[in-house]
């Protein structure tokens, strides 16, 4: 058994059991991936993948357990490489951040600017997806750090640290009837079509919970994957928007009325997610601290390496 075989097993699962896509992701040929996986299965004496002809259809029961171990091994191999690089080129390398649109668009620009000034020779990569994808990318060693609100804490291969709390605002065209409400209520919001985030994104669960607690069902006319889309369709009068507060920009969004909704919804917490026991390069710790100044490197290390 070797790390290459382990890497290919992870790549096949992470690419929807498409061997050809896994080969592209690993910069190799499809027959190479298939051969390495078959060799590994023969060495272990167990079948990792369910097959239909030459196609991989999913994991066997044993394969589920093998994949969990393979993810850990693949992560450890990544940590070894990071350790070697940190010893030889502490201020050069690649840092991959997995995050959502709201974080990438409205929160991270300040951090990226600060980081790039300190580490001009580190290449930053932003992988944008939903929180579940962000967690999977870090768990599978495709990203170093995940930044999101939902889902990160649910992945057993990750540890998370709280960074900051935030809430929501309601946005509407300037002459919309909702703007005449002196104090917003769930009852008032329930009268109108709503535009908000998809269920997998940006604290949507808190919104659903607030409506349910008040005994109302939200009339969700449209769900979106990012804040800019919500604002676009509010401008088209499709509905009123429930938006992450940091996504409202007073100058650019002056044509929309912003109404505070923090009294209606429980606050959400944005977290960083890291792979358990992962070796992080020094510049990765610096990025986290720039993003969340309340965190200290020693605190981060304690959480990462306590999870054994």
Identify the residue ranges that each predicted region occupies.
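N-terminal short secondary-structure element
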Residues: 1-31, 36
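A short LG(V/I)-centered, amphipathic sequence patch enriched
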Residues: 41-61
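Alpha-helical linker/hinge and terminal dimerization helices associated
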Residues: 43-44, 66-88
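Short beta-strand-centered segments that line the small-molecule binding cleft or hinge
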Residues: 87, 110-114, 132-168, 172, ...
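Central regulatory/effector-binding core of bacterial HTH transcription factors
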Residues: 92-154, 223-224
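Beta-alpha-beta core module
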Residues: 155-161, 165-166, 228-277
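Flexible hinge/capping segments at coil-to-helix
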Residues: 157-194
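Secondary-structure junction motif
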Residues: 178, 193-214, 279-290, 295-307
């Amino acid at each position: 058994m070797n790390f290459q075989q382990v890497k290919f097993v992870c790549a096949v699962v992470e690419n929807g059991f498409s061997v050809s896509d896994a080969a592209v992701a690993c910069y190799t040929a499809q027959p190479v991936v298939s051969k390495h996986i078959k060799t590994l299965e023969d060495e272990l004496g167990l079948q990792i993948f369910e097959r239909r002809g030459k196609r991989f259809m999913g994991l066997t029961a044993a394969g589920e357990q093998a994949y969990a171990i393979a993810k850990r091994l693949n992560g450890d191999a990544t940590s070894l490489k990071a350790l070697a690089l940190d010893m030889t080129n502490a201020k050069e390398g690649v840092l991959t951040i997995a995050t959502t649109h709201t974080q990438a668009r409205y929160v991270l620009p300040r951090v990226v600017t600060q980081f790039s000034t300190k580490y001009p020779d580190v290449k930053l990569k932003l992988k944008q997806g939903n929180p579940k994808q962000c967690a999977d990318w870090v768990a599978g060693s495709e990203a170093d750090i995940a930044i999101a609100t939902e889902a990160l804490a649910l992945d057993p291969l990750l540890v998370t640290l709280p960074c900051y709390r935030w809430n929501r605002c309601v946005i509407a065209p300037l002459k919309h009837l909702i703007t005449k409400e002196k104090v917003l209520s769930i009852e008032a919001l329930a009268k109108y079509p709503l535009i908000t985030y998809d269920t997998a994104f940006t604290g949507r669960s808190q919104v659903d919970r607030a409506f349910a607690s008040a005994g109302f069902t939200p009339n969700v006319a449209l769900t979106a994957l990012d804040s800019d889309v919500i604002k676009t369709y509010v401008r088209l009068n499709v509905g009123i928007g429930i938006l992450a507060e940091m996504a409202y920009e007073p100058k650019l969004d002056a044509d929309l009325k912003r109404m505070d909704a923090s009294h209606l919804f429980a606050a959400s917490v944005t977290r960083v997610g890291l792979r358990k026991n992962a070796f992080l390069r020094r510049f990765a710790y610096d990025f986290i601290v720039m993003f969340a100044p309340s965190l200290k490197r020693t605190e981060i290390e304690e959480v990462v390496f306590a999870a054994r």
